[in-house]
Amino acid sequence: MATTRDPLDSSIFLAPLAIDVAKIRSLAHSLCSTFTSLAASSQEQFLPTPISESVLRPDTDGKGRYLAIDIGGTNLRVGFIELLGTPDSSHDATRNGESTHERSRVRRHLEKSWPIGEQLKHNKASDLFAWIGKCIAEVVQNGCLAWPGDLPDEIPLGITFSFPMIQHTLSEATLMSMGKGFQITSNLDLGKLLLEGYEKSRGGTSNLPRIKITAIVNDAVATLVSFAYQFRSTPRRKAAMGLIVGTGCNSTIPLALSKLHPSKRPAKVKVLETETTQEDVKIAVNTEWTIRGAAGPLQELNFITRWDEKLVSEGESPGFQPFEYMTAGRYLGELGRIIILEYLTTNLHIDSSTLPPLLTQRHGVSTTFLGNLGPHLATSEPSLLKQLETGIPALKESGAWRWTQEVAELVYDIAKAIQVRAAGMTAAAVIALLACADEIHFSSAPPPTNAGPLQQHKWHRGSNRRTHGRIYRWLYRPFPGLLDRLSRFSEWDYGC
């Protein structure tokens, strides 16, 4: 079925998604004020973790083998982590795509990963954690076989959890509302649920060692902790924050206790023996920056489009995480589908009943597919048109609409616009958070109103020490170009 391109240019159609450095800088200024206010007042954002900044950067080198689990929005990972202490330059140069410099102080063993199915997300908490316990037991059993007699009777366990929680101590936490498709209620004891789940698989016998929970942290907190361990601070460099952009989007940064509302200051903070807990002590804070408290700047600066509103209205918890709907892997594919469908039916006047079924099904287009679209990213099929014909196949009936090169290029423009906006917004949030934590300072000059996208606008660092954020690169796989664009926006905005 032939199509005729509407005279309306795609750049005009996609104008609501357009951003430039001036708009991103304005967002950074506004988010900085919002973050400062949320730290001082919100009970569901800027959640404290009882870990001081000094503990993040100890003078000594930890060593040993530990059990670790990562409960994410999409996958569960379980494995043993070996801390190697002082880097060994003779260690093998590559593994899992990482360089020696990136992994020289940590080695992973017997790691396994399982997808968290939609059915599990809708089950009772006890069912979900019984399944998690079974997976843990499987890896522990493998450890017993790999190192017979070497594992202790009680294995220390560290837990990374990709959801909001109230942290009472380093090893005790209460779940808040989970989001990301999970229907589990809040106010549940995470450690208790996990131990009970493992004991069900252990069967109360001595065949498998017991586990002891020694640390529970949010995944963004864990990112910062692991980065601080991997890359020791120097007079010219330190780990400043942890950033997650995957199924969800979140960050962690050390903040002074004085910036937090008194009710959010932990009763006991883990500090070095030489320290006391003063108001100027910084602790790791899980920002949960995508929750509704940060929606104000997005609305005031017209970042939220009609497509975003439709996506949010059809989501699991409308209005709960507006920033996440615009930046995270769980939602960007669906956002693209909504935009593509509108253009085809409204601008090109194509009957939706003749379109590929995946375009009319909710979540029919994945973020992974949309992110890999394009000749510069495709490894197996350089033709943009053939990528779409294969990934979003047309109906087989005669008279059904077919992809054309012109429409394929439009879809690529949509994917790119979504990616660029997500990268710019995340960069603005990163800069805003660094400023909120006094790691950098905004210049006194007002934000420019008509700067081009390549014009640089610099902020002043709080000291002459270079700050670094740790990014889970593997989480960028759904949108391979996002990391590069995020880095470029940060460099343009921050002047790195």
List where the protein language model places each region.
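Glycine-rich phosphate-binding loop and adjoining helix at the ATP-binding site
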Residues: 113-133, 165-233, 239-241, 259, ...
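Short, solvent-exposed loop/turn and secondary-structure capping segments
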Residues: 79-81, 90-91, 169-172, 254-256
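Glycine-rich phosphate-binding loop of actin/hexokinase-like ATP-binding domains
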Residues: 87-93, 180-187, 225-337, 341
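Short glycine-enriched loops at secondary-structure junctions
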Residues: 82-84, 159-165
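Acidic/polar, low-complexity linker and loop regions
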Residues: 41, 102-110, 207-212, 287-307
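ATP-binding/phosphotransfer module of carbohydrate and carboxylate kinases, centering on a glycine-rich
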Residues: 1-109, 120-153, 230, 304-496
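A short acidic Gly-Thr/Ser loop motif
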Residues: 61-62, 69-77, 162, 220-221, ...
